[in-house]
A protein has these predicted regions:
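N-terminal accessory segment at the very beginning of proteins
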Residues: 1-314, 320-322, 326-335, 346-349
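Acidic (Asp/Glu)-rich catalytic clusters
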Residues: 339-341
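Short acidic catalytic loops
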Residues: 344-356
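Conserved small/polar residues in nucleotide/adenosyl-binding loops
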Residues: 360-361
């Protein structure tokens, strides 16, 4: 089974750090500090429902001179193209090694910095950057990213200024009975490892598409998607042979979650107004894309690589099962298809041809 990472974010043994405010930002460098407030989860009974609320916490760490109760940690913004920005948020003062030049998730052209045409060239994005007492804004003709200082929010807008989505803050719980954990990261009580949990607004009528090859509904709203490779052995479950940490919204934005760690994307399954991204990774490294689906896909594949055009027969009808075990059986199927005028371009033998060869030698 694919791991469901959401369980780690309701563990009472963990320490929770909630994104609170910008403690400083240098627009020239595109870097700043994000303040995180320390919380714990407190059990709570409401009539016949047992749940939990986030409650402020004072650390007992020793020596207290070496640790921060409410740490300031780095946030970084990079201009990628005219339709994309990269947002990286760290959960530790000791930053993990991130070497884009050796990263297999990136296309060679992206690494070289010369993908795209003159208007959308990777690394040459034209964004106007401004700062005020309330926020830092990256804006151009494609859209806008506002980094609100307090309460901290990442706010995405289209070219007309309409809010597409935004991160949630603890103050959003003031008017609700269900106290949803906002944008946070955890420090596990078991081993001090950290994982981050970006939480964004999910709007009424919003539709989400992506996350890789999936046999569930195309619109992922209402689903919890475990983005991790499993062998589902068929199309009857939500397991995925080929998960992809990328999705886009009909509201005009898309996210590439640059991570190979297991991730659980909760698109309004547990809370109708939120997309909750439970990540195994300690860093949020997101590429944010603006525009229509074709624009978003174009920018995403600039970063990760574009597939060459496949041969015509690959777009035809495939006949497959587990499994055809011999050439004779395959030819019999081919004759039956032709005799019954059933179109077919491919007969996929699947496991029948493996024989004694191990998976590692395929």
């Amino acid at each position: 089974q694919a791991p469901d990472m959401s369980g780690d974010f309701c563990d009472l043994a963990n320490t929770y750090f909630l994104a609170d405010s910008i403690a400083g930002f240098d627009t020239n460098k595109g870097e700043g500090l994000l303040n995180w407030k320390r919380y714990r989860l407190a059990p709570r009974q409401a009539f016949n429902l047992n749940g939990y609320w986030p409650v402020r916490m004072q650390m007992l760490d020793f020596p207290d001179t070496q640790y921060d109760n409410d740490p300031n940690l780095k946030i970084k913004i990079q201009k990628i193209s005219n339709r994309s920005l990269r947002v990286t948020i760290f959960t530790s003062p000791i930053e993990p090694k991130m070497n884009d030049a050796e990263d297999p998730m990136f296309a060679p052209d992206f690494i070289a910095g010369n993908a795209g045409n003159s208007n959308n060239r990777i690394g040459k994005g034209s964004w106007n950057t401004s700062a005020s007492a309330k926020s830092i804004v990256y804006k151009n003709e494609s859209g806008e990213l506002e980094i609100q200082k307090y309460p901290f929010r990442l706010i995405l807008r289209d070219a007309q200024g309409k809010i597409l989505t935004q991160t949630r803050h603890i103050v959003d719980n003031d008017s609700t009975q269900v106290k949803l954990l906002p944008f946070n990261f955890i420090k596990r009580g078991s081993d001090n490892s950290r994982s981050i949990n970006p939480v964004f607004l999910l709007s009424p009528g919003e539709r989400i598409y992506g996350c890789g090859e999936s046999f569930t509904s195309l619109n992922k709203v209402g689903q919890k998607v475990n983005i991790s490779v499993v062998d589902p052995q068929g199309p009857e479950t939500d397991g995925m042979y080929k998960p992809v940490p990328f999705y886009f919204s009909n509201r005009g934005y898309g996210f590439f979650m640059h991570t190979s760690a297991p991730t659980t994307a909760d698109f309004g399954a547990s809370y109708i107004g939120a997309q909750r991204l439970f990540m195994g990774d300690e860093v949020m490294d997101f590429f944010i894309f603006f525009g229509e689906p074709k624009d978003i896909l174009d920018q995403y594949t600039h970063v990760t690589g574009k597939s060459p055009m496949l041969p015509l027969w690959t777009f035809g009808t495939w006949m497959s099962r587990i499994s055809y075990f011999s050439q004779k059986e395959g030819l019999e199927i081919a004759h039956q298809l032709r005799n019954n005028h059933i179109p077919a371009d491919v007969i996929h033998f699947d496991t029948g041809w493996f024989g004694a060869v191990s998976y590692t030698h395929l």
